[in-house]
Amino acid sequence: IFADFFAGSGVDSRLARQNGYRVIANDWEPYSHALNHAILACTEAPAFKELGGYQKAIDYLNRLPEVKGWVTHNLCPRNDEIYDPSLDRLFFKRRNGMRIDAIRQQIATWQAQGAIDDVEMSALLAPLLYSASFVSNTSGVFKSFHHGWGGKTQTALERIESLLWLTPSRFSEVGDNKQKNPMAEMWCVDAQHLANQMSSFEVDVAYLDPP
């Protein structure tokens, strides 16, 4: 058993999964659960029976028209060309903000309609989170944004101005041996609470990499 108490993006849990461990991945940040739920639990794409398959669902989301929603109103400037960093928030270009809103709203609609289950929703949220991070006007931390597109040197301008585009997730790669295909479980709780829940059994590796 590999217990990852602060899983974050899940890179260490994925490596453990690939090496045959049963994985317990935890992080109290909801984004981590969204990233890791499907990627760790599945060895192939979920069925997406109601939507005609995973790739068709991704293609549909990429073709959606732009929508002004929460991200556009709260994380984008009023105008990409004329803005005031003391008043406007410059996390995303407006076009990408509207794409994020459109895609997230459609995923929520599918969930409300019962067209996707929790694992399938995770398989859609993960590429949205990754692609949104790629086009963000930040240096990787969302506590602040560059005061101007790309920062002082504008070295990241090409990335920030690129079109947000979803690519399918890659799921856990495990060996053919059934013993190499252990289950994985995801938690979204305080690390101490998880440790208390696990007090009745031992783990092979307890990985703690707190923020």
Language-model features: where?
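Conserved phosphoryl-transfer catalytic core
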Residues: 31, 36-99, 106
